Structures are given as C-alpha cells and as structure tokens.
A protein has these predicted regions:
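Regulatory sensory and allosteric helical modules in signal-transduction proteins
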Residues: 44-46, 55-92, 98, 106
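Amphipathic alpha-helical coiled-coil segments that mediate homodimerization
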Residues: 1-5, 10-33, 69, 193
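Short beta-strand-to-loop transition segments that serve as allosteric relay/switch motifs
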Residues: 52-53, 119-130
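Allosteric cytosolic regulatory segments
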Residues: 140-147
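A short, aliphatic-rich beta-strand micro-motif
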Residues: 103-112
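GAF sensory/regulatory domain recognition
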Residues: 19-23, 30-61
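The cytosolic transmitter module of two-component sensor histidine kinases
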Residues: 7, 11, 15, 66, ...
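Signal-transducing coiled-coil/dimerization helices and immediately adjacent hinge/linker segments
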Residues: 155-218
C-alpha cells in the first residue's frame, strides 16, 4: 500500500508540474489537466491537477466521457475554443468561472499511442481572448508532449513497483527458508509464522523478513 501511495504522489507531482509549465509557457491564467480513468466502467475522465484554484475544487472531480466541455474534447478528440464560458451551454462549471473571473477557454485532447485519447488539457484566461491557430498549435504540441511524459512516468512507476514486489517476495522466501530450517516447519507453516509475527508486531512482512535475515547473518 505504501508503495502504491508513493507512486500516486510521484505522479501527482508530475501532473502539477505539467499544468504549471503549460500556464507559464502559454501565458494563460489557469490550466487544468484531466485524464481518462479506464478502470471505471464505463470510463470516466478525472481532474488530476490545476493551479490557482482552491484545493477543494480538485478533490475527486470526475465527469462522464460525454459530459461537459472536457467530455466534448475527449469524445471528438478535437480542440475546443470558447469565447466566454458563461455563455457556453455545455460548460458545467459556471459558478467556479464566475468566482475566479474566468472568461475564455481552449481545450485540447491528450493523444497517446495510436491516437488513443488519454486526457484533456484546458486553459482559461481572466480576460476575453481570441485563441489563434498558433495558440492552439502550441497547446496541442504541449498536450502531446505531456501525454508522452505521463505515459513514460507511469511506465517508470510500474517498473519500480514490480521490482520492489519481486524484491519483497525474494526476501520473504529467504526468511521462510530460514524459519523452516530453524523450527522444522513446512513452507506454508513458515509463511504463516512470519505473517503472525507481522500482525503481532504491527510491522510489515518485509520488515519481519529482513529482521530474520539480519539475525541469521549475526548468528
């Protein structure tokens, strides 16, 4: 669990960095990053990062794939420009826009391998802004680079988790062999012994196993 949390926090930092860089490069006031969550059935699109918005706005915000401007961009896989979000029927966050003084918006899709939609990048301005073709091309380029960066980061995290899992299994297996020899137990009995020690001491099985290996080296 701790490794999963750590990996999530690492990805969260990458998401935050993306929106900060996009906002700085493009000169927009607010940038938000939404990513497709395919673990849901049907899939949803979730807000992963934004800047200059109250933290409570970000917590567990998700939309259906065909809902709002985010869903529109995700479904059509095409950029969307809105001159005034308060006048846009499909824009769902009018209360938030009024509160923050947001006016114009441009949304572009994040396309992954083989053109598969992986998310949406939304950019807002606090004054009326006519997003030009140059603006959209820049946002599209940045969005595609972000999609690659996110995918590469996910692969790195997955690799690290697999490596840690293999290391954990190997350590527990070695500890189990030591307990089998010391106490003349079967493999299953030794595993249950380690698990009970873990529960009784409120330590993880890897911590108990590492302690067993250390004691074996000392004696």
């Amino acid at each position: 669990i701790s490794r999963a949390v750590t990996s999530d926090l690492f990805l969260e930092d990458v998401f935050k960095l993306i929106v900060m860089v996009v906002a700085k490069v493009t000169g927009v006031d607010i940038c938000s990053l939404w990513l497709v969550d395919e673990e849901c059935s049907p899939p949803k699109i979730r807000l992963k990062a934004t800047q200059a918005i109250e933290p409570e706005y970000v917590i567990d915000r998700s939309l259906n794939m065909n809902e709002g401007v985010v869903g529109y961009v995700a479904t059509t896989q095409k950029p969307l420009i809105i001159a005034n979000v308060l006048d846009c029927e499909i824009f769902k966050e009018k209360e938030m826009a009024e509160k923050l003084g947001l006016v114009s918006m441009a949304g572009v899709p994040l396309l992954g391998k083989k053109g598969k939609i992986s998310g949406v990048l939304n950019c807002f301005t606090s004054a009326p802004h006519n997003f030009s073709n140059t603006d959209i091309n820049l946002l599209t380029t940045v969005a595609n680079q972000a999609a690659v960066a996110i995918r590469n980061t996910e692969l790195i995290v997955q690799t690290k988790i697999i490596e840690e899992e293999l290391k954990t299994r190997k350590t527990i297996e070695r500890a189990k062999e030591i307990i089998m020899e010391r106490q003349t137990l079967s493999g299953d009995e030794a595993y249950r012994w380690i698990r009970k020690r873990s529960m009784d001491s409120r330590k993880s099985m890897i911590e108990v196993s590492e302690a067993i290996l250390l004691s074996n080296e000392l004696y």
